[in-house]
Swiss-Prot record:
Protein name: ATP synthase subunit alpha
Pfam families assigned to the protein according to its UniProt record, in alphabetical order: ATP-synt_ab (PF00006), ATP-synt_ab_C (PF00306), ATP-synt_ab_N (PF02874)
Main location: membrane
PANTHER family xref list: ATP SYNTHASE SUBUNIT ALPHA, MITOCHONDRIAL
Species name: Burkholderia cenocepacia (strain HI2424)
Site feature location: Required for activity: 373
Record's keyword annotation contains Cell inner membrane: yes
Residues bound to ATP: 169-176
Keyword field contains Lipoprotein: no
Keywords per UniProt: ATP synthesis, ATP-binding, Cell inner membrane, Cell membrane, CF(1), Hydrogen ion transport, Ion transport, Membrane, Nucleotide-binding, Translocase, Transport
Family statement drawn from the similarity comment of this UniProt entry: Belongs to the ATPase alpha/beta chains family.
Subunit structure: F-type ATPases have 2 components, CF(1) - the catalytic core - and CF(0) - the membrane proton channel. CF(1) has five subunits: alpha(3), beta(3), gamma(1), delta(1), epsilon(1). CF(0) has three main subunits: a(1), b(2) and c(9-12). The alpha and beta chains form an alternating ring which encloses part of the gamma chain. CF(1) is attached to CF(0) by a central stalk formed by the gamma and epsilon chains, while a peripheral stalk is formed by the delta and b chains.
SUPFAM superfamilies the record matches: C-terminal domain of alpha and beta subunits of F1 ATP synthase (SSF47917), N-terminal domain of alpha and beta subunits of F1 ATP synthase (SSF50615), P-loop containing nucleoside triphosphate hydrolases (SSF52540)
EC number: 7.1.2.2
Amino acid sequence: MQLNPSEISELIKSRIQGLEASADVRNQGTVISVTDGIVRIHGLSDVMQGEMLEFPGNTFGLALNLERDSVGAVILGEYEHISEGDIVKTTGRILEVPVGPELVGRVVDALGNPIDGKGPVNAKLTDAIEKIAPGVIWRKSVSQPVQTGIKSIDAMVPIGRGQRELIIGDRQCGKTAVALDAIINQKGKDLICIYVAIGQKASSIMNVVRKLEETGAMEYTIVVAASASDSAAMQYLAPYAGCTMGEYFRDRGQDALIIYDDLTKQAWAYRQISLLLRRPPGREAYPGDVFYLHSRLLERAARVSEEYVEKFTNGEVKGKSGSLTALPVIETQAGDVTAFVPTNVISITDGQIFLETDLFNAGIRPAINAGVSVSRVGGAAQTKVVKKLSGGIRTDLAQYRELAAFAQFASDLDEATRKQLERGRRVTELLKQPQYQPLQVWELAVSLYAANNGYLDDLDVKQVLPFEKGLRDNLKTSHADLIKRIEDTKDLSKDDEGALRSAIEAFKKSGAY
């Protein structure tokens, strides 16, 4: 077969046009210095803020400081093998973590790697840990409750799906206990929970996981752990990783609850990284953007509209709104809520639950100070029956606290004042609750009804809790239909109220407590 010259040139041209050059264009730089997990790199001219960088030994870092002559990066993991002169490559990728239902029931680190010894996660999707929160147009007002099962919270500081409610208090006053009770109470309520442990002892995290397994709560919970022995970078990233895992469910029309325990430790880790990167320190040596550190995280918790979910899923999920509820925890020093990080987070969130050491030591547990605890949006999400019955409790407690302060100085009190003080003591006793024993809506309603209608007034203070427990047990055995109606309707009709009154009076007469 002979080819003429024109055919040969055409053939060569077509071959040249069809040639595919697979050159991997990557920017390279050199390590100048390594100090405490912070690396300075020279020669990376084309690098993004927050981009992943590849170091020798399959180690990755995060570019945080972009300067004229060098890049400051934080190493994710071990950095002992990295030395001056090592080659660093850009990856062109922002840090991502695995997301999806495969993570439920697992314990993972801040990068989504399993650390529970149960094998690989096998998640099909990954997502960026830094994302922009949904805009105002895509949000819906909070209207559905998150029942924590804790009497004082559900009655006086209600939490709604899509809300950000801060839990704040000194160390060892029950902040984690409140958060765990909220998770345990979500059994059968179609709410995925994410518990992010930041800077805690590994043994404490293990105890939390064990308790969640014992109560069957791990079936719908993801635990993201960055313990005290992990690097500052891991403690800084863990909340964002947990938030991304929660957003997967929110954006697909499901409900999720995330607990950050605690954000004070994250702020400390970020302060450490910032100071090592030579960023200028401000108040309490925190960097200037520590407010933005927490605001961009907590703004991602939201109730999103049906249109947002439909648009996000390309029409696969219709008519369903999703939510991500955040319960950030902040640790104060000697009750000082005017410190930098506590005031920042108080201003970002939709309310706060104050826990006080004095109340805790006095045996009032959970040690919630109802006077200064507020929920700015949760009232709209409260169930009808609890909303109807809880108003009186808040008033009784407020008046009791005011009168108790004056009663210390007064020797003779009039009858009305003494009655008010006695009622307040019994309500305070009623709101005590053991850990890991969350209550259903009907149980809370019955307790509130008994307190509001004076059934506790003639009891001795020590009899209040036995009476409450005995009453609940009695209703379970003798009035199951009444319980079912309250649970189904989340309301107390006139007929049901009459039946409940008769049941309480009959139980009180029997004296079986």
